[in-house]
Amino acid sequence: MAALRLLLGIDYGTKQIGVAVGQAITGQARELCTLKAQNGVPDWDKVQALINEWKPDAIVVGLPLNMDGTPSDMSARAEKFSRKLNGRFGVTVYTHDERLTTFEAKGERMARGGQKGSYRNNPVDAIAAALLLQGWLDEHPELLNV
């Protein structure tokens, strides 16, 4: 397998999908954007535009597990979404445990001086995507071209 240089991270949700980008050379991930979704289905043209712009070597999709590590109700949907990404765009897709990333992202938003209030009005999905992608980068240095 060729070494990975650039990755996209995705925090999958039924109404919003957070996107982050990470680079092997820095070993760092950062938030990129939040896409709207209808019952878990994104605007595939916008996903295509992100892939065309960033040309990722792989995509890491957050896998929502229960706190005991068992699959949650959303796990199957996230895995199906991962397969669709691979099938539509031919890019390698990994999944990564995303437990507590949204909770941590909300804390990070507050630490940055973000507003309290509705999660839908102040989405943290892209921050959560960056956190899960950072976790994947930290756990898989052997796959990175550093």
Swiss-Prot record:
Molecular function GO terms recorded: nuclease activity
Keywords: Cytoplasm, Hydrolase, Nuclease, Ribosome biogenesis
Cellular component GO terms, alphabetical: cytosol
Major localization listed first in the record, in broad terms: cytoplasm
InterPro entries linked: RNaseH-like_sf, YqgF, YqgF/RNaseH-like_dom, YqgF/RNaseH-like_dom_sf
Residues of the signal peptide: none
Cellular localization per UniProt: Cytoplasm
Source superkingdom: Bacteria
Enzyme's top EC category: hydrolase
Entry's EC annotation: 3.1.-.-
A GO BP annotation: rRNA 5'-end processing
Family as reported in the entry's similarity comment: Belongs to the YqgF nuclease family.
Task of the protein: Could be a nuclease involved in processing of the 5'-end of pre-16S rRNA.
Protein name: Putative pre-16S rRNA nuclease
Species this chain originates from: Pseudomonas savastanoi pv. phaseolicola (strain 1448A / Race 6)
Lineage: Bacteria, Pseudomonadati, Pseudomonadota, Gammaproteobacteria, Pseudomonadales
